[in-house]
Amino acid sequence: MRIEEIAKCFNVEVHRAEVGEANVVNLARELRNKNYQVRILGEGSNGGTITNPAAVRDPINTIFALLKLLCLKDEVLPNGKVVLGLFHRWCKFSGNESLYRENFTLDDVTKTLPKYITTGVSEPRAILHIQNSNHSDLKSKYQKNFEKFWQEKKSYLFDQYGISSWQAVCNNGTKQTNGLTDFSVSARGGLKIIFYNGEKNPISFIWMRGSGTESAFRVMCDVKVLDNSEISLTKATEFEKELLEYHSNLIKLSDSI
């Protein structure tokens, strides 16, 4: 969700594919064939960034992108016009211009990013070991358990965290399906449940995807920090742990049926 917030500041779209470098690159090709201008891709590990015309992740390219962000600062043209540097431009578009300073550091940059609490991919709680090799069947059972959980917990989730609705989304290859009504359709692809507040703004999600090579499910949770107060940070941290635990327990229950 952080990426969507950043993209919105620049009035650009985010398109998502299933996990895997090939899926991301193929989706970009499909979009270009539809006359989209796709400048940057991402696949979440090992340097992540894929910058057109490259078709693979390149950590060195990512490092140089960070250096450009730090080094390209405001420039005054001969005609007196000021061309904003990359970070200054970001601060302006994101409503954080008051946080800009000329001699900024990478720490200053991170402070302007939308704040979320996200499960770390290398954390032990981000991996579950399952027995059911039929992921469609597992997710079908998970759907029944999740819908029961929602009916039991929706009042609590609204009172504590302002959650009023949810939507299931799946990614299979280069295809994304929103408003999923049958979780089993996601098969071995990624399945995400996005939670919304009363204004229909996304404030958290849970996600899972089974490994194609081992009996493991990768899971994660993402929770928006609503403001800069310490209370909001603490509450979001606690909710990420709570929501991921609910999610993991529902998967385990579905695997045991």
Where do the protein language model's features map onto the residues?
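Phosphate-binding and adjacent anionic-ligand microenvironments
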Residues: 1-222, 226-257
